[in-house]
Design a protein with these regions (language model features):
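Phosphate-group recognition and catalysis centered on beta-loop-alpha active-site segments
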Residues: 1-241
Protein backbone atom coordinates (compact mmCIF):
# COMPACT_ATOMS: atom_id res chain seq x y z
CA UNK A 1 0.00 0.00 0.00
CA UNK A 2 1.23 3.52 -0.79
CA UNK A 3 1.99 5.70 2.20
CA UNK A 4 -1.01 7.52 3.62
CA UNK A 5 0.00 11.02 4.72
CA UNK A 6 -1.58 12.44 7.86
CA UNK A 7 -2.22 16.17 8.20
CA UNK A 8 -3.46 18.39 11.01
CA UNK A 9 -5.96 21.09 10.01
CA UNK A 10 -4.78 24.57 10.99
CA UNK A 11 -2.42 22.74 13.33
CA UNK A 12 -4.40 20.52 15.67
CA UNK A 13 -7.35 22.85 16.01
CA UNK A 14 -9.55 20.50 18.03
CA UNK A 15 -7.15 21.09 20.94
CA UNK A 16 -5.82 24.64 20.54
CA UNK A 17 -6.94 27.81 18.76
CA UNK A 18 -6.49 27.35 15.04
CA UNK A 19 -3.51 28.79 13.18
CA UNK A 20 -1.54 29.57 16.34
CA UNK A 21 1.90 28.34 17.30
CA UNK A 22 0.29 26.34 20.11
CA UNK A 23 -1.87 24.52 17.58
CA UNK A 24 1.04 23.83 15.22
CA UNK A 25 3.21 22.60 18.09
CA UNK A 26 0.42 20.29 19.25
CA UNK A 27 0.22 18.82 15.74
CA UNK A 28 3.98 18.27 15.69
CA UNK A 29 3.89 16.61 19.11
CA UNK A 30 1.03 14.33 18.05
CA UNK A 31 3.16 13.04 15.18
CA UNK A 32 1.32 14.03 12.01
CA UNK A 33 3.30 14.05 8.77
CA UNK A 34 2.14 17.58 7.95
CA UNK A 35 -0.13 20.38 9.04
CA UNK A 36 -2.10 22.90 7.04
CA UNK A 37 -2.15 26.66 7.58
CA UNK A 38 -3.57 29.75 5.87
CA UNK A 39 -1.63 32.78 4.58
CA UNK A 40 -2.62 36.43 4.20
CA UNK A 41 -0.41 39.49 3.75
CA UNK A 42 -0.52 42.31 6.27
CA UNK A 43 -0.70 45.92 5.08
CA UNK A 44 3.10 46.06 5.36
CA UNK A 45 3.49 42.87 3.30
CA UNK A 46 4.29 40.37 6.05
CA UNK A 47 2.76 36.90 5.60
CA UNK A 48 0.56 36.16 8.61
CA UNK A 49 -1.44 33.05 9.44
CA UNK A 50 -5.21 33.10 9.87
CA UNK A 51 -8.09 31.42 8.08
CA UNK A 52 -10.38 34.44 7.72
CA UNK A 53 -9.41 37.86 6.45
CA UNK A 54 -11.75 39.29 9.10
CA UNK A 55 -10.37 38.39 12.57
CA UNK A 56 -13.83 38.62 14.18
CA UNK A 57 -14.47 34.86 14.50
CA UNK A 58 -11.27 33.91 16.33
CA UNK A 59 -10.21 37.28 17.81
CA UNK A 60 -13.53 39.00 18.51
CA UNK A 61 -12.47 42.12 16.60
CA UNK A 62 -13.88 43.33 13.28
CA UNK A 63 -11.33 44.22 10.64
CA UNK A 64 -9.44 43.11 7.56
CA UNK A 65 -5.93 41.69 7.82
CA UNK A 66 -4.79 43.22 4.54
CA UNK A 67 -5.63 46.68 5.95
CA UNK A 68 -3.74 46.12 9.22
CA UNK A 69 -0.03 46.46 9.88
CA UNK A 70 1.84 43.61 11.53
CA UNK A 71 2.03 45.68 14.70
CA UNK A 72 -1.76 46.01 14.70
CA UNK A 73 -2.25 42.31 13.96
CA UNK A 74 0.02 41.40 16.87
CA UNK A 75 -2.40 43.20 19.20
CA UNK A 76 -5.13 40.67 18.33
CA UNK A 77 -5.86 37.71 20.60
CA UNK A 78 -6.82 34.68 18.45
CA UNK A 79 -7.91 32.69 21.53
CA UNK A 80 -11.17 31.71 19.77
CA UNK A 81 -13.24 32.45 22.84
CA UNK A 82 -16.46 31.18 21.25
CA UNK A 83 -14.93 27.69 21.04
CA UNK A 84 -12.49 27.55 23.97
CA UNK A 85 -13.86 30.13 26.42
CA UNK A 86 -11.07 31.84 28.38
CA UNK A 87 -8.74 28.82 28.33
CA UNK A 88 -6.23 30.40 25.93
CA UNK A 89 -7.01 34.08 26.47
CA UNK A 90 -3.79 36.11 26.50
CA UNK A 91 -1.67 33.06 25.64
CA UNK A 92 -1.66 33.18 21.83
CA UNK A 93 -1.09 35.69 19.06
CA UNK A 94 -1.41 35.72 15.29
CA UNK A 95 1.86 34.21 14.04
CA UNK A 96 3.87 35.21 11.02
CA UNK A 97 5.01 32.64 8.50
CA UNK A 98 8.59 33.20 9.64
CA UNK A 99 7.66 32.42 13.24
CA UNK A 100 6.03 29.19 12.11
CA UNK A 101 9.09 28.20 10.09
CA UNK A 102 11.33 28.88 13.08
CA UNK A 103 9.12 26.53 15.14
CA UNK A 104 9.36 23.82 12.50
CA UNK A 105 13.13 24.28 12.24
CA UNK A 106 13.49 23.86 16.00
CA UNK A 107 10.98 21.07 16.62
CA UNK A 108 10.67 19.03 13.42
CA UNK A 109 12.98 20.02 10.53
CA UNK A 110 11.58 17.30 8.24
CA UNK A 111 7.96 18.41 8.66
CA UNK A 112 5.78 18.65 5.57
CA UNK A 113 3.48 21.63 5.20
CA UNK A 114 0.12 22.29 3.57
CA UNK A 115 0.29 25.94 2.52
CA UNK A 116 -3.12 27.45 1.81
CA UNK A 117 -2.90 30.73 -0.11
CA UNK A 118 -5.89 32.75 1.08
CA UNK A 119 -5.10 36.08 -0.57
CA UNK A 120 -5.28 35.50 -4.30
CA UNK A 121 -2.41 37.70 -5.48
CA UNK A 122 0.84 36.75 -7.14
CA UNK A 123 2.61 38.97 -4.60
CA UNK A 124 1.34 36.77 -1.75
CA UNK A 125 2.66 33.68 -3.51
CA UNK A 126 6.03 35.28 -4.30
CA UNK A 127 6.63 36.45 -0.73
CA UNK A 128 5.54 33.12 0.78
CA UNK A 129 7.60 31.02 -1.64
CA UNK A 130 10.71 33.15 -1.07
CA UNK A 131 10.45 32.57 2.67
CA UNK A 132 9.81 28.84 2.31
CA UNK A 133 12.85 28.56 0.06
CA UNK A 134 14.94 30.57 2.52
CA UNK A 135 14.18 27.92 5.16
CA UNK A 136 14.79 25.05 2.74
CA UNK A 137 11.28 23.68 3.11
CA UNK A 138 9.70 24.56 -0.26
CA UNK A 139 10.16 21.04 -1.63
CA UNK A 140 8.25 19.60 1.35
CA UNK A 141 5.16 21.75 0.76
CA UNK A 142 1.82 21.20 -0.86
CA UNK A 143 0.27 24.46 -2.04
CA UNK A 144 -3.51 24.82 -1.82
CA UNK A 145 -5.87 27.50 -3.12
CA UNK A 146 -9.53 27.85 -4.05
CA UNK A 147 -8.45 29.90 -7.06
CA UNK A 148 -7.43 28.44 -10.42
CA UNK A 149 -5.28 31.40 -11.45
CA UNK A 150 -3.18 31.08 -8.28
CA UNK A 151 -2.83 27.30 -8.70
CA UNK A 152 -1.61 27.84 -12.27
CA UNK A 153 0.79 30.59 -11.20
CA UNK A 154 2.30 28.32 -8.54
CA UNK A 155 2.75 25.52 -11.04
CA UNK A 156 4.03 27.56 -13.99
CA UNK A 157 6.39 29.93 -12.14
CA UNK A 158 7.64 27.68 -9.33
CA UNK A 159 6.74 24.13 -10.39
CA UNK A 160 5.18 23.88 -6.95
CA UNK A 161 3.31 20.80 -5.78
CA UNK A 162 -0.25 22.03 -6.16
CA UNK A 163 -3.62 20.93 -4.86
CA UNK A 164 -6.83 22.52 -6.08
CA UNK A 165 -10.46 21.67 -5.46
CA UNK A 166 -13.42 20.54 -7.58
CA UNK A 167 -14.36 23.00 -10.30
CA UNK A 168 -17.58 24.17 -8.65
CA UNK A 169 -15.69 25.19 -5.49
CA UNK A 170 -13.02 27.20 -7.32
CA UNK A 171 -12.74 30.82 -8.31
CA UNK A 172 -11.26 31.44 -11.77
CA UNK A 173 -11.25 27.72 -12.55
CA UNK A 174 -9.54 26.94 -15.87
CA UNK A 175 -8.97 23.19 -15.88
CA UNK A 176 -7.24 20.49 -13.87
CA UNK A 177 -3.97 20.41 -15.80
CA UNK A 178 -2.16 22.62 -13.25
CA UNK A 179 -3.24 20.34 -10.37
CA UNK A 180 -0.91 17.72 -8.95
CA UNK A 181 -3.56 16.62 -6.45
CA UNK A 182 -7.20 17.35 -5.66
CA UNK A 183 -8.84 18.22 -2.35
CA UNK A 184 -12.17 16.57 -1.50
CA UNK A 185 -14.17 17.57 1.57
CA UNK A 186 -16.04 14.98 3.59
CA UNK A 187 -19.49 15.60 2.09
CA UNK A 188 -18.03 14.92 -1.35
CA UNK A 189 -16.21 11.84 -0.06
CA UNK A 190 -19.55 10.55 1.23
CA UNK A 191 -21.36 11.19 -2.05
CA UNK A 192 -21.34 9.74 -5.55
CA UNK A 193 -19.36 12.81 -6.63
CA UNK A 194 -16.28 11.24 -5.05
CA UNK A 195 -16.05 8.57 -7.72
CA UNK A 196 -16.39 11.23 -10.43
CA UNK A 197 -13.47 13.27 -9.12
CA UNK A 198 -11.31 10.26 -8.25
CA UNK A 199 -11.67 9.17 -11.89
CA UNK A 200 -9.59 12.17 -12.91
CA UNK A 201 -6.55 10.20 -11.73
CA UNK A 202 -5.28 12.82 -9.28
CA UNK A 203 -4.11 11.80 -5.80
CA UNK A 204 -6.80 12.93 -3.36
CA UNK A 205 -6.44 14.88 -0.13
CA UNK A 206 -9.59 14.26 1.92
CA UNK A 207 -10.73 16.51 4.79
CA UNK A 208 -11.65 16.74 7.60
CA UNK A 209 -11.93 13.22 9.03
CA UNK A 210 -12.29 13.44 12.81
CA UNK A 211 -13.80 10.03 13.59
CA UNK A 212 -12.53 6.53 12.97
CA UNK A 213 -15.48 5.94 10.65
CA UNK A 214 -14.66 8.96 8.49
CA UNK A 215 -10.96 8.07 8.41
CA UNK A 216 -11.78 4.55 7.23
CA UNK A 217 -14.15 5.90 4.59
CA UNK A 218 -11.37 8.12 3.22
CA UNK A 219 -8.97 5.18 3.14
CA UNK A 220 -11.55 3.04 1.37
CA UNK A 221 -12.09 5.85 -1.14
CA UNK A 222 -8.37 5.88 -1.93
CA UNK A 223 -7.10 8.99 -0.14
CA UNK A 224 -3.39 9.79 -0.46
CA UNK A 225 -3.59 12.26 2.44
CA UNK A 226 -6.19 12.74 5.16
CA UNK A 227 -6.63 15.97 7.09
CA UNK A 228 -8.15 16.14 10.57
CA UNK A 229 -9.02 18.78 13.13
CA UNK A 230 -8.41 16.05 15.72
CA UNK A 231 -5.60 13.86 14.38
CA UNK A 232 -5.88 11.23 17.13
CA UNK A 233 -8.27 8.78 15.37
CA UNK A 234 -6.41 9.28 12.09
CA UNK A 235 -3.01 8.56 13.64
CA UNK A 236 -4.31 5.49 15.47
CA UNK A 237 -5.57 3.95 12.25
CA UNK A 238 -2.63 5.07 10.11
CA UNK A 239 -0.06 3.42 12.36
CA UNK A 240 -1.63 0.02 11.66
CA UNK A 241 -1.70 0.32 7.87
Amino acid sequence: MKKLYTEGHRGACAYCPENTLLSYEKAIDMGVDAFEFDIWLSKDKVPVLMHDCNPKRTCGVEGCLRDMTLEEIKQLDPCYEEKFGNKFKGQVEVPTLRELLELVKAKRPDMMLGVEIKEYTEETVDIAVALLKEYGIFDRCWFYAFNGRIIRYLKEKYNARTMGYPDFQMQEFDGYDAYDEIGLCMWICKSELCEFYMAKGLPAHMFCADTAEDVQLCIDRGASLITANDPAPLLEIAKNL
